[in-house]
């Protein structure tokens, strides 16, 4: 009977180590464009100076590469099971970090589990943009319900009471869908299609991308003006003022 070969942890190192810091992947985060994975902290810091993947050199996103990152919780669990003591070491490092950085707010040197979770939430909030992207170029949007005579019963989607909104050009279709689900009080399992000019938009499409590539305005509706609160900024810095961009929504249609 052939003996089974035992694999050492180092045999898996090419798959569980970070290309940037050369250590084990902590909070593994994958770039959706090329599927390369890095530590969350490493790749976020890298994207502060570059829009390219540090491993293959491909451009991840023209303006905001952070939109193309996804946490890989499954890989994280695999790494913790492969490397003895790594989970405990990481939890200890995180605890020590909050002890050093949050003593004044907690009023004590020792952070309990409850205090630690609060500190984690506060840390996440501090990393968010304080002005909620209000300093970004803004775009006016009309969210119009696409009426369909085929809708019936629970499949009917109503129109919004206030269908005009103003948001950052970096907002994605996925965020718009969440906004609609919240406003229309739809169940979490309910899925919507968002369309522009009759074409279904992908969840990662930004409002800027849709405006520049799908929202086909006629010449008389588009004029270059001086800077004002209602203007939209294009990628080359040109400012435009126009009628709101119209996005339509409807219950998702399964073509399969």
UniProtKB/Swiss-Prot annotation:
Its main location: nucleus. The keyword Transcription applies. A zinc finger (RING-type) spans 18-57. Pfam families: RAWUL, zf-C3HC4_2. Keywords: Metal-binding, Nucleus, Repressor, Transcription, Transcription regulation, Zinc, Zinc-finger. Selective knockout in hematopoietic stem cells has only minor effects on gene expression and hematopoiesis, probably due to functional compensation by Pcgf1. Component of a Polycomb group (PcG) multiprotein PRC1-like complex, a complex class required to maintain the transcriptionally repressive state of many genes, including Hox genes, throughout development. PcG PRC1 complex acts via chromatin remodeling and modification of histones; it mediates monoubiquitination of histone H2A 'Lys-119', rendering chromatin heritably changed in its expressibility. Within the PRC1-like complex, regulates RNF2 ubiquitin ligase activity. This is Polycomb group RING finger protein 5. Residues 110-120 have a biased composition (Basic and acidic residues). It comes from the Eukaryota. The keyword Metal-binding applies. Disruption phenotype: Combined disruption of both Pcgf3 and Pcgf5 causes embryonic lethality; there are no live progeny. Male embryos are detected at 9.5 and 10.5 dpc, but are smaller than normal. Female embryos are already extensively degraded at 9.5 dpc. Placentas from male embryos have some parietal trophoblast giant cells, but fail to form a labyrinth. Placentas from female embryos lack trophoblasts altogether and fail to form a labyrinth. Defects can be attributed to the observed lack of monoubiquitination of histone H2A 'Lys-119' and lack of Xist-mediated silencing of one copy of the X chromosome. Residues 102-133 are annotated as: Disordered. SUPFAM superfamilies: RING/U-box (SSF57850). PANTHER family: POLYCOMB GROUP RING FINGER PROTEIN (PTHR45893). Component of a PRC1-like complex that contains PCGF5, RNF2 and UBE2D3. Interacts with RNF2; the interaction is direct. Interacts with CBX6, CBX7 and CBX8. Interacts with AUTS2; the interaction is direct. Identified in a complex that contains AUTS2, PCGF5, CSNK2B and RNF2. GO terms for cellular component: centrosome; Golgi apparatus; nucleoplasm; PcG protein complex. GO terms for biological process: positive regulation of transcription by RNA polymerase II; random inactivation of X chromosome. Gene3D superfamilies: Phosphatidylinositol 3-kinase Catalytic Subunit, Chain A, domain 1 (3.10.20.90), Zinc/RING finger domain, C3HC4 (zinc finger) (3.30.40.10). GO terms for molecular function: histone H2AK119 ubiquitin ligase activity; zinc ion binding. CDD domains: RAWUL_PCGF5, RING-HC_PCGF5.
């Amino acid at each position: 009977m052939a003996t089974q070969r035992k694999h050492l942890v180092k045999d898996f190192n090419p798959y569980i180590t970070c290309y940037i810091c050369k250590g084990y992947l902590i909070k593994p985060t994958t770039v959706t464009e090329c599927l390369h994975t890095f530590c969350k902290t490493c790749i976020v810091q890298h994207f502060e100076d570059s829009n390219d993947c540090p491993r293959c050199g491909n451009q991840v996103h023209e303006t905001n590469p952070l939109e193309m990152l996804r946490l890989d919780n499954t890989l994280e669990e695999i790494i913790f099971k492969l490397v003895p003591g790594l989970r405990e070491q990481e939890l200890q490092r995180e605890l020590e970090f909050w002890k050093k950085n949050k003593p004044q707010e907690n009023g004590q040197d020792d952070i309990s589990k409850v205090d630690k979770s609060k500190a984690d939430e506060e840390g996440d909030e501090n990393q968010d943009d304080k002005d909620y992207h209000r300093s970004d170029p803004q775009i006016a949007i009309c969210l119009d319900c696409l009426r369909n005579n085929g809708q019936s019963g629970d499949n009917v989607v109503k129109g919004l009471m206030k269908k005009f909104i103003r948001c950052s050009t970096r907002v994605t279709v996925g965020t718009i869908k969440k906004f609609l689900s919240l406003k229309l009080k739809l169940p979490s399992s309910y899925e919507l299609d968002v369309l522009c000019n009759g074409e279904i938009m992908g969840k990662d499409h930004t409002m800027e991308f849709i405006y520049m590539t799908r929202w086909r305005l006629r010449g008389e509706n588009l004029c270059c003006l001086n800077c004002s609160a209602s203007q939209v900024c294009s990628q080359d810095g040109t400012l435009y003022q126009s009628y709101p961009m119209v996005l339509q929504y409807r219950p998702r249609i399964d073509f399969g």
